[in-house]
Amino acid sequence: MASHVDPLVVGRVIGDVVDLFVPTTAMSVRFGTKDLTNGCEIKPSVAAAPPAVQIAGRVNELFALVMTDPDAPSPSEPTMREWLHWLVVNIPGGTDPSQGDVVVPYMGPRPPVGIHRYVMVLFQQKARVAAPPPDEDAARARFSTRAFADRHDLGLPVAALYFNAQKEPANRRRRY
């Protein structure tokens, strides 16, 4: 599984979002019919709804899934790094995020300018996390994946994937 780290280094996910780690848990992500691979391009319209995420592991293991945009509001000036798009804790191994506790509901990509990276990081929890009810109005700007991991004693990630997205052109209407 160590070969999965290299694209994360090239894509600057290692460094901008998380520290160097060795993946130890398989995680697959799919938007519609598109399987996510590191660095692939996904249209925001395709990612408007939460992806199908499958997490390996045993059912007695718990995981936390964080999805952020480290390039908000623009890749050249990421003053809101990281923008939190999704946070789910207490996900049993061998299942998906619908089996966990949603802390911050999913928000699809909305890149205003430039090509943005959207990073999904998986942590194995040492214990159950006391999860507040889902909060649509949660502070999403300037979230720190590292600080979240430190606060909940999660250690290094066990898996991560990222994709790129950019603003889609508006549909042009014909005028007669």
Curated annotation (Swiss-Prot):
Gene3D superfamilies: PEBP-like. Pfam families: PBP. It comes from the Eukaryota. SUPFAM superfamilies: PEBP-like (SSF49777). May form complexes with phosphorylated ligands by interfering with kinases and their effectors. Belongs to the phosphatidylethanolamine-binding protein family. This is Protein MOTHER of FT and TFL1 homolog 1. The gene is MFT1.
